[in-house]
């Protein structure tokens, strides 16, 4: 196994109006089916799928949230902690595209951590009824720093590719995170080395200072010894000279 390979779980939440095809996209991707009849999701549904991308393992935890307004207040429970938000609109209904913009503002207001946003124009099998131009959607995706994809859950177009691109982005982000952690560790290691070097230099300076103090003390001691010995010798010499003088004086007196 490649030591640089990644194994991760990623929470993915699908947001958007009711009947834009969120549940159909989830079922197409996870189970490979397109149900002929679907009822509106109540609250949220939960599906999982694990994929491998170039030796990296990703387990998608897919939350399909309800699009009805009466469940809007519960949405924060579903997108909290999500790594990816897929904002789905129906290309044949301009209103669903406008509603997506409200979801974007809500995400920005309630999510502090970085999240991958994907703007998904679904139902391209109904191209003849398109109301939202691809160019318009792409410009908005660039504005919010999101990926833009177009899909058809019915015809199984773009669905696999969307989750593949999401996976590649997740892997890239994880590698970047590891690289930042490595850089931080290197920075801390460098600071630690610098601190150790400073402590070592301080220790050397202290040793030199102690040696200088010892040398000074030794020199002072030598000077004191020299002074004491010189003073003692001078006293002895002075005493001898005095005795000699007295003796000479006495000799002169005796001879006289």
From Swiss-Prot:
Composition bias (Polar residues) maps to 230-256
Q: Name one GO biological process term.
A: intracellular protein transport
Q: Could you cite one Gene Ontology molecular function of this protein?
A: GTP binding
Q: Where is the lipid attached (S-geranylgeranyl cysteine)?
A: 254-255
GO CC list: endomembrane system; plasma membrane
- Entry-linked Pfam families: Ras
Compartments where found? Cell membrane
Q: For this UniProt entry, what is the primary localization, expressed as one broad class?
A: membrane
Swiss-Prot/TrEMBL keywords? Cell membrane, GTP-binding, Lipoprotein, Membrane, Nucleotide-binding, Prenylation
Region annotation Disordered: where it falls in the sequence? 229-256
Descriptive protein name? Ras-related protein RabJ
